[in-house]
Structures are given as structure tokens and as C-alpha cells.
């Protein structure tokens, strides 16, 4: 058998492969067609379902629209039914509108009449208000005068108290001196009993003088009692002064209430002006409504109703305001009555006491002059007595010499002389003890002069030992005491002056230290260095924190530096320092401004003749330059006459008596209305016032 392949066999195999391929392609096409058919069927089903849904939606929409059409048809039928009713109502409203227009015109006329009456009442009230203002100003002036008089009386009372203390001290000293003189006179009277007829005459004179001195002492005691009574009366007057001060405080509270009433009055005036404007606009709008009656009836009726309501509200408000105003007038009348009562009380209770005090002061002054005269007379009498005592001592010395010559002849007389000498020695010892007591008292009273007083008794004793009499020593002691007291007073005055100078130096040093501290604080270089140093410290801390966070590999949220906050704080501190510096500068500028403004006002008053004062606006208290008060230098302070210039309203008002107002009106008519020269008006007013008050 051969191994080669036959061609027939090969042909069969090729045909089989072709058939298989054809079958596979047919199968693929059939599957694709089936898939396509299935897709089409699915699409058909979806389209059917969508069509069904759309049909349902269509049915629902048609049903809804049918319902809406039915409802609209019903509404149309209802509107057709209501149209006749509306037409009838329209006719009725038109008739009502005409009636209401007539009523509104009548109401407007009534309101205009009421407005005129209110204006008249307002004018009357303004007149009453001005009269009350004048009364209030008069009462204020009276109160100021009374306060001034009370202060003067208090000062006079204090001076009288001081003078009473001084007089009491002098009276005590005079009593002590008179007691010592009486004791001396009694002792000398014992000695003079043993003398001759010539000595008896001197003794009688001395006794009469001593009796006169005793009478004078009794008179002084009576005067001291009177002064004590006056002291008690002065204390009572002080209590009355305190009660008056309480009453004045109450008057200040009343003044504050009065200012509040003035502010309320101005507010009411503004409200009245607004109401008048509203009425004018309402009347104008009502005229416009009459022109446009046919255009818009419903708007016209609503506006008429609103206007009527507005008028009713206005009437109610006017009634409430009138009640409030009446209550305020009653309060003002009560306050004026209280002020008048206080003024009457002051005039009835305190003016007679003041006159009594003035008369008592005059009496006290006369008494003081009389006391000084009696004091001088007593001093002269004391000197005369001292001289007479010296003469008596000389006579006694001559008699002693005569007795020594007659000792040899009369031994009996020697015994009497020896007794007399022993009595004199005893008197000298008693005087020495009294001198020691007086010296001790002077030492206790004047501690600063201990050394000088310790030296004086030794000198006095030496003088006693060196043939000086007791009376000369007493006179020298009194002179030395007077000199020492004068030196002490001088030393005390110098000490007070030195203390005052030391206190002033301390104040100056404290001010210098404060100024240095302020300079150090406000030094710009030091502030700049301090700010730079703080910023450097903050930047260093920030860099250190950033380096540490970078090394530690912390998350981003924790890597935000805290130095930024510190830098902001430093910026805040710097801004606060700038703010403080600016506030200090502003306060200094204000102080300088006030000083300069005062200087300018004084210069204007000196060279232009008017004292300027800026008054605050009662509506806006912060506005301090809208009103200027001008007071002439030639008007006395007793008369309250001045001019007020209103800068905003360009007005000028004269306040004061009738003569001043008449002068201002005449000069304003000539210089302002005719010549339009306001500065000439001011100079003419000054000249006229100078002519009037210079002639007086």
C-alpha cells in the first residue's frame, strides 16, 4: 500500500469545514436577530407603559381642569350675584363720604378755632412763664444775698468768739492783778494805821481808789456775763444758719426741677409745631381729594377716615397735655408759694436777728472801746499807786533815819521800830514766796523760756540783796514777762512761717519728682527702645518655638506659633500707650484752652466793656456755643441786666428792668434795623449805660 494521500479524500474534508462555518454564521445571525427582536419587544412594552402613564396623567389633568372650570363658573355666578350688592354699597358709601366730608370740614374749622385758642393760651402761659422766671430770678438773687450776709455774719461771729476769749483772758489777768493790788493795799493799810494824819489822807485816797477798782471789777464781771449770753445767742444763730443752708439746698433741688420743666416745655412746643404741620398737610391733601373724587373713591374714604382718627387722637393728646400742663402750672405755683414763704420767713425771722446782731456788734465795739479806756485809766492809776507807794517807802525810810537818831534818847521807840522792821521782813518773805509762785506759773506756761526764767530769779534775788525795793522788782518782773511773751510770740510766728515754707518746699519737690517721672514715662526714645526690645523678645520666642516644633515633627495644627499672639499683645500695648499719650495731650490742651479763654474773656471785658459767658442749649446741652450772654461792665452787680445772642436763630434778647429793655429796643431800631451795624449797637449800649450810671 502506498502512503500518499488521495485527492478525493481531501475534497471531502474541505466541504465539511465550509458547511460547519456556514452553520455557525447562520446560528450567530439568528441569535442576533432574536436579541434585536427581544430589544424591540422590550422597547414596545416600555412605550406602551409610558403611553398608558401619559394617558392616565392626561385624564387626571383634564379632570382637574374640569373641576377648576366648574369652580370658576361658580365664582362667576357668585360675583354676578354680588355685583348688585356692591353697586348698592358703592352708592351708600358715596352718600356717607359726602356726609363725612361735611363733618370733616366742620371738624377742621373747629380744630382751627381750637388751635387759635391753644395759641392764645400758649401766649398767656409764656407770659406767666416769663413772670415766674423773673420771680425765680429775684428769689435767687435774694437767696444769694442772704447767703453772702450769712457768711459775713458767721465770720463776724467767729471774730467775736476770738475777741471774747481774748477779753476773758485779759479780764482774768486783770482780776489777778487787782486781787494782788487789793492784798497789797490791805497790808499797807495795816501799816498806815500807825501813821500820822498826813498818812491817813493818803490811806483814805487809796481806799477810795481800791473801792473804785472793786466796782470796776464788778462791772467787768457783769460784762463778761453779757458776753457769755451773746455767745449762747451766737450758737443759736449758727443753728439757724444751718437750717437756712438746708432750705437753700431744697431751693437748689427746686431749681433743677424748674430746668426739667423748661426742657419739657420746649419739647411740647416742638410737638405743637409738628401737629400744626400735620394739620396743614391734611387740609392740603383733603383739597386734593376733592379734585380727584371721580378717580379713586376708595382711597379717598380711607384717607378721610384716617384723617378723622388722626384728629381724634390729636384731641385726646391735647387733653392729656393740657392736664399735664395744668398740673405743672400748679406745681410751679406751689413752688413759687414755697419760695415766697421762705423769703417771708427769712425776712421775718432772720432779718431782725441780723439787725439785732449788728446793733449788738456796735454795742460790743463801744464796750470794747470803753474797756480799753478803763484799762488805760487803771494802768495810770496803778502807776500812780506805785509812785505813791514809792513815796511812802521814802517817807518810811526818812522816818527810820530819824528814829535811828532818836534811839539814844528813846529806848521805847526802839522796840516799836524793831517790831516794825520784823513785820517788814515778814512781808518781804511773803512777797518772795508769791514771786516764786508766779515764777513757777510762768515757767509752766512758757516751757521754752525755762533757762531765761531760771536766770531771772537769781538776778532778782541779787537785786533784792542789793538794796532794791520789792515794788521795783515786781515792775521789772512784769516787764521781763512781757518781753518774754513777745519773744515767744515772735518765735511761734517764725516757726509757723518756717513750717509753711517747708510744706511749700515739700510740695515743690513732689511736683518736681512727678514731673521727672512723667518725663521718663513720656520720653519717646525710651518708649521706642522698650517697644523694640519687646518685639525682639517676642520674635526670639517665636523662632525658638518654630525650631522646636520642626525638630519634634508635630502636626500642622500644633505648629502655629504662640509668639503671634504675644506680638499682637505688644501691638495692643503700643497702641494703648499712644492712646494714653494722646489723652494726656488732649487734657493738657483743654486746660490751656480754658486758661487762654479765661484770659481772652478778661481782656474783652477790660477793653471792650462786655463780660462774655457761653450758655448751653437747653435742647442740646452739649452745644455750648449757640447762645452768648453779654453783661456790661457799667451795670452794677445788684441789677441783673444782660443781653443774650442766639447764634443759630440770629436773635437778640434783653433781660432786666424796663429801662434797660427800652434802651436796647431804641438802639436796635436805629443801628440794626436802619443801618445794619450790630457792633455799633453794642458800643452805643455801653455808652448809654455809662452816661446813666456815671451820673448816679
From Swiss-Prot:
Basic and acidic residues composition-biased segments:
402-413
Q: Where is this region: Disordered?
A: 1-22, 394-415
Localisation per UniProt entry: Nucleus
Q: Name one GO cellular component term.
A: kinetochore
Identify one Pfam family in the record.
MAD
Q: Cross-referenced InterPro entries, in alphabetical order?
A: Mad1
Offer one example of a GO biological process linked to this entry: mitotic spindle assembly checkpoint signaling
Q: Does the keyword Cell division apply?
A: yes
Tell me the keywords, alphabetical order. Answer: Cell cycle, Cell division, Mitosis, Nucleus
Q: Self-association or partners: how does it assemble? A: Component of the mitotic checkpoint complex (MCC).
What is the annotated role of this protein in its UniProt record?
Central component of the spindle assembly checkpoint which is a feedback control that prevents cells with incompletely assembled spindles from leaving mitosis.
The similarity comment for this entry is: Belongs to the MAD1 family.
Q: Kindly provide the name given to this protein in its UniProt entry.
A: Spindle assembly checkpoint component MAD1
Source lineage: Eukaryota, Fungi, Dikarya, Ascomycota, Saccharomycotina
